[in-house]
């Protein structure tokens, strides 16, 4: 099964954190590296799924927000990944977002579903969520817990609706925030994991930071997480997410 993975570029190099490539391979899939000059329609026809990886901030200016704390942005990269995301989504391919990937998907969802802006809010900055800068912790170490739905995150068959607590790493400062009384949000968007970390007491009474969400009924299925499972080697997460598509690929090959 071929999983697309967009890569970044400098003036002289294309590059991607090798942890993403190893993550896809360890789950039993074939990574397909996609550079920004690729023909999106052609390349997506050869894919079985897409991972939108972490990276630099999504440029808030494009979405009508002031840039108050994003020191590195790349509007061309943003546009390429937006186009790639929608091409896969409209082809009903499963899309898995990681960190920046979650942020880009959430912003595109809010544009397409303006009614969701009443209970979802994109923050251009939140504190206490970048362990590399604030705590000098390596990427593969966990730094805080999130509450999560095991059913939505891992496809657990357990009937219990009680959230589980899982430790995660954290390397971001842009964030999606939801009103507590409103989650899960709508029929398409479901909050999968959340935390109050980074919120002051008054904010935490009414809101939570969205650490993971799923979207259905908007093209291919979508799951996005704010942490970095590729560094934690959580292969079960993407194996479960892409398993349905893998069955289709195998069936079509018979």
Language model: regions and residue ranges:
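Active-site loop->helix "elbow" adjoining a glycine-rich segment at hydrolase catalytic centers
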Residues: 100-102
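N-terminal beta1-alpha1 cap of cysteine-dependent amidohydrolase-like domains
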Residues: 1-98, 107, 111-173, 177-218, ...
């Amino acid at each position: 099964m071929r999983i697309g993975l967009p890569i970044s570029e400098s003036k002289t190099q294309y590059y991607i954190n090798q942890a993403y490539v190893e993550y896809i391979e360890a789950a039993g899939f074939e990574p397909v590296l996609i550079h920004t000059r690729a023909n999106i329609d052609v390349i997506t026809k050869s894919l079985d799924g897409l991972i939108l990886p972490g990276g630099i901030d999504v440029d808030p200016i494009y979405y009508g927000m002031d840039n108050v704390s994003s020191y590195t942005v790349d509007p061309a990269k943003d546009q390429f990944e937006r186009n790639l995301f929608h091409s896969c989504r409209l082809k009903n391919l499963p899309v898995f977002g990681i960190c920046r990937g979650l942020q880009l998907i959430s912003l595109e969802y809010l544009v397409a579903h303006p009614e969701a802006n009443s209970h979802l809010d994109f923050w251009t900055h939140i504190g206490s969520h970048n362990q590399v800068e604030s705590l000098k912790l390596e990427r593969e170490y966990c730094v805080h817990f999130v509450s999560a739905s095991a059913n939505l995150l891992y496809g657990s068959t357990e009937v219990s609706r009680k959230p589980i607590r899982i430790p995660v790493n954290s390397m971001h400062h842009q964030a999606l925030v939801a009103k507590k009384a409103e989650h899960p949000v709508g029929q398409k968007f479901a909050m999968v994991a959340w935390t109050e970390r980074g919120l002051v007491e008054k904010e935490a009474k009414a809101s939570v930071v969205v650490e993971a969400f799923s979207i259905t009924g908007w093209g291919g299925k979508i799951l996005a997480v704010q942490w970095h499972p590729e560094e934690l080697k959580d292969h079960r997460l993407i194996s479960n997410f892409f398993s349905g598509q893998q069955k289709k690929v195998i069936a079509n090959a018979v």
